Amino acid sequence: VSKFRLIEKRWSTNFEKYVFILANKSKYFEKICKLFFPDLKFLTVPKNETWRFQHLIVPSMSNYNDGILTPHMPVWIRHLANLVKKKHTRPHKKIIITRTDAVNRNIKNQQHMLIALKGWECVELEKLSIQEQVQTFAEATHIVSPHGAGLTNLLWCDPGTKVIELTHKSFFGKKVYPVLSHHLGLKHSVLLCDTVPI
C-alpha cells in the first residue's frame, strides 16, 4: 500500500488510475483495497505464466526481508483510519494478541501469562474485520503480541502506546515493527524467546 503513496508523490497523480500487478494472491491486501481503495484495479500473475507489458513501473525493494519504511509513509497510511473508525475514544485498553489457530508462533505458556496479566483483553485478529482491527489498536494503551503481520495494525495506535513484541531469537534482525513504532512515537520493546518443540 505504501507504494501507492510513492506514485502519488513522484508524479502528482491519482494512483488509482493504474492497474497494479501482484506476484502473490493476498486476501488481506484484497480486504484493505476493498475498504480503503474501492476503485483500485489489481491483478495477480498466475504461477508458471509470463506476462509482457508495454508500460511498467517497478518500485524498488532494496531490503526485501525487512521491508522499507520512511518516516512520512506510516503517517500517510495512518490517516486512512479516520475513514473507518466508528468513534474516537481515548486509548484505554490493554490487549494481548493471541494466535490460537496458528501453526507456529504460539505462546506455549500462554495460560500462565494470561493469569499474570489479569484484566488484559485477549484479541484474535483473525476473527476481526479490518474495521474492528483498526478500532481495537486505536483504543489500546498497551499491547503484547507475537511477531507477525498483525502488528501492522500498530499504524492505528496513538503516540505513547506501549508495545512488547515476542519474537524468536533468530528473528532479532527483523526490525520492521520497532522501526514502524519509532516513526509513530510508540514505545516498542522486543522480547527474545526460545523455540519449544510442540
Describe each model-derived feature in a short phrase:
Residues 1-198:
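The feature primarily captures lumenal catalytic ectodomains
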